[in-house]
């Protein structure tokens, strides 16, 4: 039997509040929506749940508020097989929320998202200090940018010092220090985040411009990133590392109804 990898996810919980509408309101305007949904999410929780569904042993470290959203999100992750025993509760701050306006048309849907981090942003280095010794017991550490950057940089350095691979999804896009980039065994931005961090856009207007990809890849390698994975939406993904640059096409879909799914 294959060993189940032990994955540590240090990241966010966000309750998605999704309002679907034919047209997003202008400033000062009210429109009648099509429907409203709530969905437990957060980039960290989503990573944890998907890894658990793929068979990994997953421990989630994060923070929620002392409210219904916090309880729903931790229960949802636990029901997927994620160990949430290290998820803390901030009794003075609300759980994180993502407010999503989903503009639906006959051609698909576009989203506009406002994130209120809440308790995610009150998680401190002191709260996760126990990881400094425990982190060596994991096969991989996964993080995103919905926590305070000090927490992300500190945990990434602990993992690197312990020889544990680190995967970072730099979203939402934010400046990355050379120290943090050098800790990333795997960096997985989308094309917009990659352009911001590398200082060079990737043209996908007529297909993927591989010269742009090569420039971006070299920029990251020069700052210490070992392996780069760039997601390109309908244009697939790029994997770049010591073996070169590889472009993988995505599965073509006739219609995408919900980009938040």
Report each predicted region and the residues it spans.
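Short glycine/threonine-rich catalytic loop with a Thr-x-Gly-x-Asp
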Residues: 37-40, 44-47, 232, 250-261
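Conserved N-terminal subdomain of the carbohydrate kinase-like
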Residues: 4, 15, 27-31, 38, ...
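Positively charged, low-complexity intrinsically disordered leader regions
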Residues: 1-27
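Conserved phosphate/ATP/ADP-binding segment of small-molecule kinases
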Residues: 153-247, 252-255
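Short, small-residue alpha-helix embedded
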Residues: 48-50, 54-56, 195-196, 256-261
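A short, N-terminal amphipathic alpha-helix
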Residues: 41-58, 217-223
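Residues that scaffold the ATP/ADP-binding catalytic core of kinase and kinase-like folds
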Residues: 17-18, 114, 197-200
């Amino acid at each position: 039997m294959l060993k189940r990898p032990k994955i540590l996810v240090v990241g966010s919980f966000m309750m998605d509040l999704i309002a679907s509408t034919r047209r997003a309101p202008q400033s000062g305007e009210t429109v009648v929506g099509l429907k409203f949904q709530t969905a437990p999410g957060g980039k960290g929780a989503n990573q944890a749940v998907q890894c658990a569904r793929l068979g990994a042993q997953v421990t989630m470290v994060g923070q929620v508020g002392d409210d219904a959203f916090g309880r729903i999100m931790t229960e949802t992750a636990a029901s997927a097989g994620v160990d949430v025993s290290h998820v803390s509760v901030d009794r003075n701050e609300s759980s994180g929320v993502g407010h999503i306006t989903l503009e639906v048309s006959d051609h698909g849907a576009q989203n506009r998202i406002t994130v209120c981090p809440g308790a995610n942003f009150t998680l401190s280095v002191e709260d996760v200090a126990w990881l400094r010794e425990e982190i060596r017991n994991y096969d991989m550490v996964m993080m995103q940018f919905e926590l305070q950057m000090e927490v992300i940089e500190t945990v990434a350095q602990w993992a690197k010092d312990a020889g544990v691979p680190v995967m970072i999804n730099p979203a939402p896009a934010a400046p990355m220090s050379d120290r943090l980039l050098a800790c990333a065994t795997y960096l997985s931005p989308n094309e917009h985040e990659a352009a911001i961090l590398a200082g060079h856009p990737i043209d996908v207007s007529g297909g993927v411009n591989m010269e742009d990809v090569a420039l971006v890849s070299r920029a990251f390698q020069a700052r210490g990133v070992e392996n780069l994975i760039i997601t390109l939406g309908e244009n697939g993904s790029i994997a770049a590392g010591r073996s070169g640059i590889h472009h993988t096409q995505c599965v073509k879909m006739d219609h995408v109804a919900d980009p938040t799914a």
